[in-house]
Amino acid sequence: MNPKKNNNTFLSYFVCLFLLLEVGLGQNQISEIKVGVVLDLNTTFSKICLTSINLALSDFYKDHPNYRTRLALHVRDSMKDTVQASAAALDLIQNEQVSAIIGPIDSMQAKFMIKLANKTQVPTISFSATSPLLTSIKSDYFVRGTIDDSYQVKAIAAIFESFGWRSVVAIYVDNELGEGIMPYLFDALQDVQVDRSVIPSEANDDQILKELYKLMTRQTRVFVVHMASRLASRIFEKATEIGMMEEGYVWLMTNGMTHMMRHIHHGRSLNTIDGVLGVRSHVPKSKGLEDFRLRWKRNFKKENPWLRDDLSIFGLWAYDSTTALAMAVEKTNISSFPYNNASGSSNNMTDLGTLHVSRYGPSLLEALSEIRFNGLAGRFNLIDRQLESPKFEIINFVGNEERIVGFWTPSNGLVNVNSNKTTSFTGERFGPLIWPGKSTIVPKGWEIPTNGKKIKVGVPVKKGFFNFVEVITDPITNITTPKGYAIDIFEAALKKLPYSVIPQYYRFESPDDDYDDLVYKVDNGTLDAVVGDVTITAYRSLYADFTLPYTESGVSMMVPVRDNENKNTWVFLKPWGLDLWVTTACFFVLIGFVVWLFEHRVNTDFRGPPHHQIGTSFWFSFSTMVFAHREKVVSNLARFVVVVWCFVVLVLTQSYTANLTSFLTVQRFQPAAINVKDLIKNGDYVGYQHGAFVKDFLIKEGFNVSKLKPFGSSEECHALLSNGSISAAFDEVAYLRAILSQYCSKYAIVEPTFKTAGFGFAFPRNSPLTGDVSKAILNVTQGDEMQHIENKWFMKQNDCPDPKTALSSNRLSLRSFWGLFLIAGIASFLALLIFVFLFLYENRHTLCDDSEDSIWRKLTSLFRNFDEKDIKSHTFKSSAVHHVSSPMTQYIPSPSTLQIAPRPHSPSQDRAFELRRVSFTPNEERLTTQTIHFEDEESDIECVVEQ
C-alpha cells in the first residue's frame, strides 16, 4: 500500500469529519437573547413576580429543550421611583442592548418607558400596569400582559343596577392609577350620581381621617375604592375606627385591590373589610396551576426565606407574559446583535441623543401579538396588544373568607353563582350576602347625615309676593327664618318623612331675581336643597332634581275687566258662532221642504196655493224650535224626520239658553283683552314678574322686548294695570291667583294657559330625598293640611269667583254639534230616498209607457200626479166619513149627495168621475157604493151611488 495515498485518504476523512462536527455544532448552537426586567426589588410584590418570571423561563425551556434561543434576564431596580425606572430602562437599551423589557410595576413608571420603547422599537411588556391612561399613549411597542382597569366598570355598573343604588362616591388615588379609570366609570354609571373623593398617594392618617369625616356628612353611603392596595388597607382601617364599616354602608373594591387585599394583610384577620364587595378577574382552576403554586412556594421560600406570602394574580400574569415573550423570541429567531448602530457615540448610558434602534423589534412585536395559549391566569390572547376582557368574579369578604357570590361576563352580564342564567343578587344566590355591620339586609345606599348635621337649604329673597316666601334675618343672631306658602308646604312634607331631616336655611339674594344661580349652588354642593317659588324648567333640571310640583302649573294672562252692560244690544247673537247660525238656518229650510214633500199628497194642511204651502212649510219647520207647531203630520216618513229634528232642536235650544245666560251674567264683566295674538298685533305693553323665565317665554311667543315691563310685587302689577301702562300681565297661575286674592273684582285670568311644570323643591341630582319629599308632598296636597295652608296665605281668594270662568270667547261653533246635524241629515236623506222610491213605483206606468210622449211630458205628468191628492190615502178616506154629522145632531142632511171626482190620469188622458150618494136613516148610517162607467172617446165616467 502506498503510504502517501493512505495519508491523503486519512486527511480527507479528517476534513469531512471536521466539517460534519462543525455543521452539527452549528445546528445545536443556542442563542442567548438579552431581556431586561425593571422591578421595585425591595418590595414583596416584585419579589413574588420575579420568582414567577424565573420559573416561567425554567418551565418553558424544560418543556422545549430543542429551542435555539434562551432568554437571559438583566434585572434592574426602579427603587419605587419613576425617574429611576426610566433610567434603568435606558441603561438596558443602551448598554445591554436588550431585545425586550419586562415591567415596570406600576402605571406611573410605565408612562415614560412607553415613549422610550416606541422610540427604540423595543417591545415592553407589563404584567401589572393596569391604568387605561396608558392606552391613550400612542405606542405600538407597549404590550399589556394584564387586565385593563376599564374592563371592570361594566361589572361594577351591573352591580349598581342590580341593587338600585342611585348615588356613589368614587374614592381614588391622585395619580395615573386612580385617574385613569374615572372617565370609564362615569360613563358606565350614567344613571347614577357619581361624586369624587381624591386621596393623595402619600396621604398620612390625618389626611385620610379628614376625608372620611367629610364623607360621613354626605347622604351617600356607597363607596367604590380604586387605588393601590396598601393605601386602601389604611383607609379601611380608619373607616372601621370612625364607624364607617357599620350597617348601612356599602364598600366596593376594584380588581387589583380585591386580588391583593389578602396579601397586604399577610395572614392577619380581614375584619377591617368585613362585608366589603369586590370585583376581580376570574382565574380558572387547573391541575397545572395547583402544581405551579407548590413549586412557586418552594422557590420563593428559598429566594426569600424571611418573607411569608402567597402567589397573587400578578405573579400569574408575570409567568404568562414571560412565557409569551419566550415563545415570540423563538419564533422571531433574533440574532445576538439586535440593534442598528446609532449615529455618534457616547459612553453616557443616559445619552438620549444616541439611542439605538432594535432591528428585530417590529418582528418580535408581530410575533408576540400572534401568541395564543392557555396560561395559568387564563386564556392569553392579545387584542390590540392587551389581554382580552375576562370573566369577573363578585367577591364578598366575610371574616377571613372570600366568598364568590356571582360572576359577570361580557356576553351574559351578571350570572348566578350556581347557574348560567342571568340574574341579580336580589334573587337566589350561593349563601347569604353579608354587608358591613354583619347585616344581611341590602343597604339602600344613602342616609341622612349623622351627628346632628343639618341639611343646608337655600331660600330666595323676594321683593314681593311675600305670601309665597319671605326671609327674615335676625341682625343680632344672624339666624335666617323664612316663612310663606312654600316654606309651610316644605316643612309639612318633611314631617311626613319616615326619618328626621333638620333644615338649616340660608338666604340668597340676586340683583336680577334670577334663581338659576341658586340652583347652581345645589349642583356644586354648596347647598343641599332649594326651597321657594322655584319654577321647574328643563334648563334647571340639568343641574338639580326637582320634586313633584306643589302648585298649579301653567303660565297665563291676567287682564282688567270692564262692565259691558251697555254694550249687549246684540248679545243674543253671541252664544252661537256664524257657522252654527248658518247651518241651523239651512237645516230649518231643509226639514221644512222634506216634511212638505212627504205631506203634500196626503195632508190638506200642506196643500193650497203655492204661497200658502211655502208659508206652511216654513212655519212648521221654525215652530218646532219652540214645539208650537199645530199642523198634524200624517206620513210616517215625515214623523220619523220630525222626531229626529225635534231632538236636534232640543239640544240646540238648551245649549243656546245656557250660553246666553253665561253671556248675560258671568260675562257681563268682559276682559279688556282676551287674545295673545291681538296684543302682539296691536303692539300693546305687557307685564311680567322681574327675574322670571316668563320674559324669555314672551319673547319666544313673539312679543317685542321693548313692549315688556317688569313688576316685582302684586302691588306693582296692580299699579301698571290700573293706570294703563300695560294691557295684560303674564305670570304663572300661582302668582296670578295671589294677585286675584287681593284684587279679585278688578282682574280676570284669561285662557289659554301655557303649560309649565309648576313650582318644586330642588335637590342634588340622584338625591334620595327627591323621591321621598315628592311622596310626602302628595300626602300633604291630598289632605286637609293643604287647605289650611292655602287659607292661611291666600284667604281672600276663596271669596272670589273662579278666575278662569269662560272669559275667553267661548261661542258655540258647528264643531260642537256637527254630529247632531249629521244624524238629522242622514235621517232626512234616507226618508227622502224611501219616498222617491215608493212614489216612482206607484207611478211606474207613467214613466214606463210605450207611447211616443217625450221625457219632458212624462215628467210633467209625473209632477201633476204628485201635486194631486193621494185618494188612496187613509187620511182622505177617513175624512169622507167624519165630515158627516153624527146621528145625535139636529142637522138633517139632504137625502142624497152626488159627487163626481176625476180619477187619476191615465196614460190616454181618459177621465173618470166618481158619483157618490150618501143617505142616512135616523138610527144608522149606511154607505153603499155603485159604480157606473160612461165611456166614450173623451172620457170614462164612474158613477158611484151610495145608498
Curated annotation (Swiss-Prot):
Subcellular location: Membrane
Transmembrane segments: 578-598, 608-628, 633-653, 820-840
Signal peptide residue numbers: 1-26
Membrane topology, as annotated: Multi-pass membrane protein
InterPro entries recorded: ANF_lig-bd_rcpt, GABAb_receptor_plant_PBP1, Ionotropic_Glu_rcpt, Iontro_rcpt_C, Iontropic_Glu_rcpt_pln, Peripla_BP_I, Solute-binding_3/MltF_N
This protein's UniProt keywords: Glycoprotein, Ion channel, Ion transport, Ligand-gated ion channel, Membrane, Receptor, Signal, Transmembrane, Transmembrane helix, Transport
Glycosylation sites: 42, 118, 333, 341, 348, 420, 478, 524, 659, 704, 723, 779
Cysteine disulfide partners in this protein: none
Cytoplasmic side: 599-607, 629-632, 841-947
Main location: membrane
GO cellular-component term (any): plasma membrane
Extracellular-side segments: 27-577, 654-819
Tissue specificity remark: Expressed predominantly in leaves.
Gene Ontology molecular function, alphabetical: calcium channel activity; glutamate receptor activity; ligand-gated monoatomic ion channel activity
Gene Ontology biological process terms, A to Z: calcium ion transport; calcium-mediated signaling; cellular response to amino acid stimulus
Complex formation: May form heteromers.
Biological function: Glutamate-gated receptor that probably acts as a non-selective cation channel. May be involved in light-signal transduction and calcium homeostasis via the regulation of calcium influx into cells.
Family to which this protein belongs: Belongs to the glutamate-gated ion channel (TC 1.A.10.1) family.
Name of the molecule in the record: Glutamate receptor 2.8
